[in-house]
Swiss-Prot record:
Lineage, highest ranks first: Bacteria, Bacillati, Actinomycetota, Actinomycetes, Mycobacteriales
Protein name: Alanine dehydrogenase
GO cellular component: cytosol; plasma membrane
Annotated knockout phenotype: Non-essential, it can be deleted. Disruption suppresses alanine dehydrogenase activity, impairs the utilization of alanine as a sole nitrogen source while cells grows to a 10-fold decreased saturation density under anaerobic conditions.
Family: Belongs to the AlaDH/PNT family.
Catalysed reactions, as listed in the record: L-alanine + NAD(+) + H2O = pyruvate + NH4(+) + NADH + H(+)
Name of the coding gene: ald
EC number, as in UniProt: 1.4.1.1
Function according to Swiss-Prot or TrEMBL: Catalyzes the reversible reductive amination of pyruvate to L-alanine. Required for proficient utilization of D- or L-alanine as a nitrogen source. May be required for the adaptation from aerobic growth to anaerobic dormancy. It could be involved in the maintenance of the NAD pool during the shift to an anaerobic dormant state in which oxygen as a terminal electron acceptor becomes limiting.
Organism for this UniProt entry: Mycolicibacterium smegmatis (strain ATCC 700084 / mc(2)155) (Mycobacterium smegmatis)
Catalytic site: 96, 270
Residues binding substrate: 15, 75
Oligomeric form and interacting partners: Homohexamer. Trimer of dimers.
Pathway assignment: Amino-acid degradation; L-alanine degradation via dehydrogenase pathway; NH(3) and pyruvate from L-alanine: step 1/1
Activity-pH dependence: Optimum pH is between 10 and 11 for the oxidative deamination and between 7 and 7.5 for the reductive amination.
GO BP annotations, alphabetical order: alanine catabolic process; L-alanine catabolic process
Length: 371
């Protein structure tokens, strides 16, 4: 199979969808790999590295898109890429379609077979291709929150860990999944007083046990969450409903009563965000103000640390990439129920029930294509 990897063109997206080790494994199995020149530079992987592993380096994105049978990306296609999508090609990438009707419409119009990293799900409910980037985004969220709390960047002028005689920052983390857990871990490591909210008592027990009570855990009720947010210096939203839009858990009226200079970091922005006022931002312009607070809603946070993110991501995606290349998408998905859950579109049909519900579009069960 011919596998293609274009350069990512989203704002400040420096990750790449494959490493030289992945190229070597694909070519060892008899597959061809073409990579757009410079695709790995942001992750400190040179064209020479890819070529030495067996890839062919091509000059343009158009050539990669037009020739590849299996196209690997990191982030969802954006408008300049819509016209390149085509029937007969399999696209394997993060999609987050519930938050993007234009991308969904473009995929359906093109007839492309698309499989979303973020909805590949095991029988136990694990999300193996979302987890590594959730770890990165969670850890980054505490760092960027601390950064924007500095007065010179519009924040309250609060140090996360405080100093002897001065209280540390109050940090509220909404959601104790992979991203929230990692956010809480780093924030607590910086010395902040951290409170984690979640609806799953067993998850809260795990957090409490692992941190020996150093992180406060609270069952998420509207009343208690609202009161905690109002008192917080930093709020990190890490809520996930796989494949669907994130629920809006922090309202504009609550934000209006927060401390001036408080910071809100919305990790869930890829899925529409979990704060009422959230809207996607970029690494170039990462923040905006609501009332007297600072919102940070960068939709590709891990793109800021591509050397770490690229290798973390591809360590998880490559087993699935190899299945798709070896068997084709139908046989691969028919033999792997986790991969099948990632199926999003095929031949103009929307195969994700959660996306169909959120965007009010017709849903088609993927099972009919896998029989």
């Amino acid at each position: 199979m011919l596998v293609g990897i274009p350069t990512e063109i989203k704002n400040n997206e420096y990750r790449v969808a494959i490493t030289p080790a992945g190229v070597a494994e694909l070519t060892r199995r008899g597959h061809e790999v073409i990579i757009q020149a410079g695709a790995g530079e942001g992750s400190a992987i040179s064209d020479r590295d890819f070529k030495a592993a067996g890839a062919e380096i091509v000059n343009t994105a158009d050539q990669v898109w037009s020739e590849a049978e299996l196209l690997l990306k990191v982030k969802e296609p954006i408008e300049p890429e819509y016209s390149r999508m085509r029937k007969g090609q399999t696209l394997f990438t993060y999609l987050h379609l519930a938050a993007s009707k234009p991308c969904t419409d473009a995929l359906l119009a093109s007839g492309t077979t698309s499989i979303a990293y973020e909805t590949v799900q095991t029988a136990e409910g694990a999300l193996p291709l979302l987890a590594p980037m959730s770890e990165v985004a969670g850890r980054l969220s505490a760092q960027v929150g601390a950064y924007h709390l500095m007065r010179s960047y519009g924040g309250r002028g609060v140090l996360m860990g405080g100093v002897p005689g001065v209280a540390p920052a109050e940090v509220v983390v909404i959601g104790a999944g992979t991203a929230g857990y990692n956010a809480a871990r780093v924030a607590a490591g910086m010395g902040a007083h951290v409170t984690v909210f979640d609806l799953n008592i067993n998850t809260l027990r795990r957090v409490d046990g692992e941190f020996g009570g150093r992180i406060e855990t609270r069952y998420s009720s509207s009343l208690e969450l609202e009161e905690a947010v109002k008192k917080a210096d930093l709020v990190i939203g890490a809520v996930l409903v796989p494949g669907a839009k994130a629920p809006k858990l922090v309202t504009n009226s609550t934000v209006a009563h927060m401390k001036p200079g408080a910071v809100l970091v919305d990790i869930a922005i890829d899925q529409g965000g979990c704060f009422e006022d959230s809207r996607p931002t970029t690494h170039d312009e990462p923040t905006f103000k609501v009332h007297d607070t600072i919102f940070y809603c960068v939709a590709n946070m891990p793109g800021a640390v591509p050397r770490t993110s690229t290798f973390a991501l591809t360590n998880s995606t490559m087993p699935y990439v190899l299945k798709l290349a070896d068997k084709g998408w139908q046989a691969a998905c028919a033999s792997d129920s986790a991969l099948a859950k990632g199926l999003s579109t095929h031949d103009g049909k929307l195969l994700s029930e959660a996306v169909a519900k959120d965007l009010d579009l017709p849903f088609t069960d993927a099972a009919q294509f896998l029989a």
